[in-house]
């Protein structure tokens, strides 16, 4: 039965999970290491030791701070990445999807490179449903994501098929026929060179249209920019 109690208390991260700070990989890095080394953006090497258990979510400490990564094996995280380890009240995937939903940029207080502080992460509050309800939520999220992935795959396949069809139409209709006359462009029209935009044309009440190469697409002129 789904959990019908919608009054779950908000819990601070410091009470329901552990944050593993990353460390320099210099002394553990090796080409044939058993464990992956993760930075905030993904795998950057291999190591012969690990810091985090499988089922940990990576959240960037510096740099890429808003793209959580779920890792289903033991790994070493460097000092630009936090390992968010769920406690007994949290399912690993439920915590991961919460991290996907949460906007970590709201905690960024840096003025240059995006950065997060461990103390700010531990102060994050989240609702913690019962474990069966977390399991149901995770299953539903993954079911919907799977459907979306299939839809994207179908869309990409359709776009590729349309591109092939478009090219076939052009080839069929523009391949020279026996009764066609081959001539130079200068014989049937005028080729004009473009010019840079004139400030006086840009500033007037009704600016002259300016077409760049970027405006010319397979579907015609795109004048949105």
Per-range role (PLM):
Residues 11-54, 71-72, 76-79, 186-200, ...:
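Sequence-specific dsDNA recognition surfaces
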